[in-house]
Amino acid sequence: MPKHSKRYLEARKLVDRTKYYDLDEAIELVKKTATAKFDETIELHIQTGIDYRKPEQHIRGTIVLPHGTGKEVKVLVFAKGEKAKEALEAGADYVGAEDLVEKIEKEGFLDFDVAIATPDMMRIIGRLGKILGPRGLMPSPKSGTVTQEVAEAVKEFKKGRIEVRTDKTGNIHIPVGKRSFDNEKLKENIIAAIKQIMQMKPAGVKGQFIKKVVLASTMGPGIKLNLQSLLKE
């Protein structure tokens, strides 16, 4: 069993572990239990009813949070010529082609949160799969990161579009803001995230798709949400 800090144990006392909280109350509580000295990220942990053994039930896509995550997103773009210029003008942090592939391969450069590529770049970045894939950074048409519309993609990811995927236990983890966000912004982000995840339900999923939703800060305890009231929001 991991040993928890005194701060965490004190925060856990504030949470009734048998209770399923309404969203407004959960947001108040998650802020109270976020007592670290930095501006903690507020995260949504969603347990789904997918069968992870079936690849067609894996979820991977993007959602848009109306107020972003509160984190400055570094965007890298693999593109050449006019598309490279468009990406830079849209605010991309790094733009290049073979030079960036080499930097990632030889120098282990990974100082970015999202990688976008034009379709013609896939032949040269394919070999980065082993490096970028496990980190969730490999451009993919499914997640909207392989596109000709690089300027639009850069702007959207900078504004608050984030990639989501199920992990090996069928759970989805989504940053929905910071402790410093006001309650209404957190609420709007959470509701937007849940609604968009509901739309990603794979056709083959039997029974309940979203089984449990937990709200937590980076260093704080989990707060279970009342699913019935949440899905009515």
UniProtKB/Swiss-Prot annotation:
GO terms for biological process: regulation of translation; translation. GO terms for molecular function: rRNA binding; structural constituent of ribosome; tRNA binding. The keyword tRNA-binding applies. Keywords: Repressor, Ribonucleoprotein, Ribosomal protein, RNA-binding, rRNA-binding, Translation regulation, tRNA-binding. Transmembrane segments: none annotated. InterPro entries: Ribosom_uL1_bac-type, Ribosomal_uL1, Ribosomal_uL1-like, Ribosomal_uL1/biogenesis, Ribosomal_uL1_3-a/b-sand, Ribosomal_uL1_CS. PROSITE patterns: RIBOSOMAL_L1. One of its GO terms (cellular component) is large ribosomal subunit. Pfam families: Ribosomal_L1. CDD domains: Ribosomal_L1. Belongs to the universal ribosomal protein uL1 family. Binds directly to 23S rRNA. The L1 stalk is quite mobile in the ribosome, and is involved in E site tRNA release. NCBIfam families: rplA_bact. Part of the 50S ribosomal subunit. This is Large ribosomal subunit protein uL1. The lineage of its organism: Bacteria, Thermotogati, Thermotogota, Thermotogae, Thermotogales. The gene is rplA.
